[in-house]
Structures are given as C-alpha cells and as structure tokens.
Amino acid sequence: MPAGVGDFMKKKVVFIIIYVLLCLTPLAMLPLSKDTSAEEKRDLSAFPEVKKEGKLNLSFFTEFDAWFTDHMGGRSYLVEAQTMMKEYVFGESANSSVILGKNGWLFYEETADDYANVASLTERNSRNVAVTLRMMQDYCTERGVDFVFTVAPNKNTLYPDNMPAWYVRTSGKSNLDMLAADLDRFGVKYADLKSMFLKEPKAYYQPRDSHWTYEGGMLAYRTIVNKLSKEHSLFEDVKFTERADWDADLVNMMYPGAPDTDVQMYPEITYSFTVKGAFVSDMDMVIETTGGAGEGSLLMFRDSFGNTTWRYFAEAFAEADFERAVPYRLNTIDRIGADTVVLEIVERNLKNLAEKAPMMEAPKRNLEVLDAYDISDRDNQVASRTAGVFFHIYGSIAPEILDEDYHVYIIAKKSGNAVFYEAFPIYERELLTSERCCDNGFSCYLPEEVATEADSLGILTVSNGKYYYIPYTK
C-alpha cells in the first residue's frame, strides 16, 4: 500500500473515532445531568413507558427523544452557550417566556398583555372580583378583623422605558386599571403600590428578576401597613447592604443553573420572631411565626412577591400566618385568632381572582321574593362537592339573563322557612373544566350541616330587577 494511502486511512480512522466519541459524550454524561425544571419553570420530559394501558407505546421513540434532549449530559452548558449567543450577538431571547429588554433588563412574557393594556378580564369580571373582595372585607369586619388588599405591579408597568420598542401600548385599560376603579366603587381597602412605586425615582425591581428587591419589599410593606387601622413598625432606620449573590428567576429561565450573581439589597435587621415547625424556603406553602416584636395576629395570603416581605410582617406582628395556597381559606381567621388580613397578588395573576372563590362561609341575606321565573331549561351549569367543612355549590347562569351587576343566592329551605346565602360572582373555571374564564359564574360555600339538613336547595339570581330560579337536587 502506498505511504500516502496509509496515512489517509489512519486519519480517516481517527476522524471516525473522534466522531463516535463526540456522539457518545452526551450519553456518557447522562449520570452527571441535573434536574433544571425549577430554573426553566417547566416540567422536564419523563422517561417513556414501552407499554401504555396494556398496549405498545407507538410514541416511544418520539417521547424518548424528548426525554434525552431534556436530560442529556452537559445540556445546561449547551443551552447556556446558545442563549448567550442569541442575547449578546443577535439581541434575541432564547426563551419564549422571557422578553429581552433594553439596557440588559429582562421581563416576564406573561406580563406583555398587561403592558399593552390588553385586558384578560371583562368589565363584569372586574366588577365580580371587586364584589368578592368586598364580601371578604365584610366577613373580616364582622369579626373585628382589619382587611387590606394589594397588588404587586408588574415590572414593566413601573419601568416601561426598558421594554423593547416593538411592544406597543394601546389606549385601552389594563386589568389593574379596571379593578382599581371598581375597588374604589365598592369601598375595598386597597394599598395602591403602583402609585407609590411610580413616585420613586429609584428602581426598586431587579433588572434581571421579575420581583422587587428587599428594599422594594420594604416600600411595599410600609405602604400596606399604613392602610391598617393600627400602627406597626415602619423600620424607619433600616439600612440595606448590596451583595451580588441573588438567584434571579428570569436569568435562570434563560440560563438554567447559572451562578447566583445578581445584585440584591439586604436589610440590616435583627429579627426576634421564630418560625414554627419546619422551614424549607421562602416559597413554603405555609409559614407560621411567633415572637415578633409587634402586637396582634396576621393572616397574609401572598405569592412569590411575599418572599422578600414576609419577614417584615412577621417582625411587626406577635403572631403571623403566611399562606400561598388557593383558594384563600378565610375561615383560617377563626383557627388562628387573626386580627388582620392582608391579601397580596401580582398584577399578572389578577385574572385568577375571577376563577376561584375564597373559602369562607357564605353570608346570610334578608330577601323578600314573591315570584321568580324558572330558568332551569336555560343554558345554566350547577354542580356541588364537599370541601372540608363546607358544601360547595357552584356553576354559571345563562348569559342572556344577566346584567352587569347580577347577584346570586343559594336558598336553603327547611320546614317551610327559607334562608338566603349570597354566592360569590365567581366562575370556577377549573372545577367547570372550562378552557377560558367566563363572567357569569357563582360559587358558594355553605356549612355542610345546612346543606345536609335542608329539605331543598335552589339558586336565585337577581338581575335587571327580576328574580330567576333554578331548583337543585342534592
């Protein structure tokens, strides 16, 4: 064999070996792969089953490809390299859930409609949410409990100059615009964080995280407690220390597993409270504290924006209970003896308030009904379930029946006497298995014994000055 041919064959063999090794590298590194589902805010593909429901899984290889793509060794580094190239070379976001803004800012894509003033709530949805919050407030007031509602503004609501130019704002009203007006109309005690933050020349949200800083959380805390009837500590002399060690959520969505290097402002506070029971993280569904320096007992319904504020509240109250679960369990007031309730929700999730009613005993109402139209043949939905100590009856009323200010009552009849319970005007989208939120719903939590002992139940709707009735069989 000529020498030149031999050298060529050797090079060819070396090339083949290198190629095979490169192909096998991701497979060999599988044991080193890690779960990045939390950082990417999605569930990674599971390893497929060969059989499903006793039959051969014909999608096995497609599902295996998805699993391997999500779990191959070194995937996070390849994703990071691709993301960096897209962001810094092409000026594009590699993650459809993240908006690449100006000046290195990142925004959550789910806030785009709010930014553009494209409301996901109808006007009646907004009114229904405000009525629900007013009913929650009345429930608290009747028990001598203070109530405050607040909304954590989206980052691009406060700092629009850092949004990309191709995101255009319309002249319409956002969910928050509509709801703020309805809260005022129905007299709901509202801590307006949007107005407070807009007054500040300093940015209190992190450029590459969707939340406010601890310093921004302090501003929110002060705004909220200033709406309460009793005075609480404002931590007026607190100082903040800057450290570049924060685990920014939007960065993790772009760069899963990236080091924690974003700037955070940490408060210099010595806390006296202690956490009851086990504590895992700020995202625990329930955090209970005792021994705070202040007075009173707090029940706070919160989301991830509460991660940087709950310690302030825990210190300001002797006892506190922070809950992330929905529906909001307002009956917890009696269990813990709370004298204050705060409900905080981020702007982008306001639509959720129209889709799930709080869990509390429905208020009794005095009504005189002489006659009502039977609408049981209309396009209504009525369903029920047992929910803890409650009998939960919910559904929807035929849309053509309803005006913008409808009310729904559950009638419990026993021994010829009728008791009226007002339902929340909430459409239980998840329970009704609807793909979208509607604005013609009702949801009512009755004490279980009321439903059990009643001779009959019915649904009474008041709309356009008329009464409409739907009999219900338990």
Model-derived regions, located:
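Extracellular glycan-modifying ectodomains
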Residues: 2-474
